[in-house]
Design a protein with these regions (language model features):
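A glycine-rich phosphate/pyrophosphate-binding beta-strand-loop-alpha-helix module
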Residues: 92, 96, 100-138
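Generic N-terminal amphipathic, Lys/Arg-enriched alpha-helix
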Residues: 1-20
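Active-site cofactor/substrate anionic-group-binding motifs, chiefly glycine-
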Residues: 46-99
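N-terminal glycine-rich anion-binding loops that anchor highly charged ligand groups
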Residues: 2-5, 22-48, 62-73
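A glycine- and small-aliphatic-rich helix-loop capping segment at beta-alpha/alpha-beta transitions
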Residues: 59, 126-135, 151-158
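Solvent-exposed alpha-helices and their adjacent loops that cap or buttress functional pockets
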Residues: 70-73, 102-104, 129, 152-156, ...
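Phosphate/diphosphate-binding glycine-rich loops and adjacent basic-rich segments that engage nucleotide
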Residues: 145-181
Length: 181
């Protein structure tokens, strides 16, 4: 089995993303997402997903230079517009904001729309737990698998993630989805 060093993955992912219009910082952050997912053995949301993201960038389906913006704020609840930006960067920004709101109000909820695939949803549960917050994250998807006993794609994977900080360096974490990733 071919082994690629984590640092080499980040460097190459970043190089390709910068060549497709990402800023240096956003390319580094996005490359880290791909490499960490691969490092954790979630290749479907790491190295195996990368060619598809490059294809989407080349087709203009992902806009590499946009930043999600808050469209509506109601105290502890906000709705954000992703502007077809890169899903993991938008989702990280949304979770950062949800944690800020939670620390201010005791709860923080951010809905993010018009974004791209957020990759491994569990990343944002960990992000919340590492910030000392309980993270509950979910997403809807396009139909990508058949219902039990069927052949045609009728249901989405629709992941649900929960993460709770237990102590300074430990969290209770559950990443559920309808198929094996």
């Amino acid at each position: 089995m071919l082994r690629i060093k984590y640092e080499d993955m980040v460097k190459e992912f970043k190089r390709v993303l910068v060549s497709r219009g990402f800023t240096e910082k956003n390319a580094e952050d996005a490359a880290t997402v791909f490499a960490l997912n691969s490092l954790d053995g979630i290749y479907s949301h790491g190295i195996n997903r990368f060619p598809r993201v490059v294809e989407y960038l080349d087709k203009g389906e992902i806009n590499p230079d946009v930043v999600a913006t808050c469209e509506m704020s109601m105290g502890a609840i906000e709705r954000w517009e992703g502007h077809r930006g890169f899903g993991p960067l938008n989702a990280k920004q949304a979770m950062d904001r949800a944690c800020e709101l939670a620390k201010q109000y005791g709860i923080g909820m951010v809905a993010l729309g018009n974004s791209n695939h957020w990759m491994r949803g569990g990343s944002y549960g960990w992000q919340a737990a590492n910030a000392g917050c309980i993270g509950i994250c979910w997403s809807n998807t396009m139909p990508n698998m058949p219902a039990w006993g069927g052949k045609d794609r009728k249901i989405g994977n629709n992941p649900l993630i929960m993460a709770v900080p237990k102590s300074k360096n430990s969290s209770c974490y559950n990443d559920n989805h309808m198929n094996r990733v």
